[in-house]
Amino acid sequence: MSTTKAFDFFIQWHLTERCNLRCRHCYQEGRSFQELSLSEILGTIEEVAEMITAWSDSYGLSFSPSFTVTGGEPFLRADLFDILEAMKQKGFELFLLSNGVLIDRDKADRLSQLGVKGVQVSLEGPKEIHETIRGAGSFSASLEGIGHLVATGIPVTVNMTLSKLNGESVFPMIKLAKNLGVQRLGFSRLV
């Protein structure tokens, strides 16, 4: 029996545990972990693509596969764009989660050329609150990254992890998100 509905098949992949920030609420402890090599990652992408094809053939199902790439901070991997290209070549839609600090215009353009469907950037509130949580200088750098993404037409979600430090900042964040021109504003679990 075959169905015409394509089932979403998504994987969130933490490509690295490394991060350029040390956020108060983050479970990433800044410890050093051995990362998969580029060849190991490419092999895993191939295996996942083959598995989806086998399931499709065996069960008569259609899939809409995607990877959401995150970390740590995925832009700390020098081979990030090689990885994204390999995912795209295997038919995966691409999404990223980032703190936005390392996203310059060139990176935003490359993401757009790859057809990235969306990037989620974390902002924890207005500047003072954001920098209390994420570190000095991170607010303006994240806003700059968001601006580059918006300029390329990539859909951007601003995400705020709610806590006692920023819980009163929800309404200012709605205004900020609107002013930034982002498509979505999300709120993560209370920590």
Q: Which residue stretches match the model-derived regions?
A:
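Residue-level preference for long, well-ordered alpha-helices that form the structural scaffold
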Residues: S37, I41, G135-S138, N166
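Conserved radical SAM core fold
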Residues: N20, P74-L76, G100-R105, G118-A136, ...
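Short low-complexity, flexible loop/linker segments enriched in glycine and/or proline
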Residues: V48, D109-Q113, R134-A136, P172-K175
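Conserved alpha-helical substructure of the radical SAM core
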Residues: M1-K117
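Conserved C-terminal portion of the radical SAM core fold
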Residues: Q12-H14, M51-T68, K90-F95, K117-G118, ...
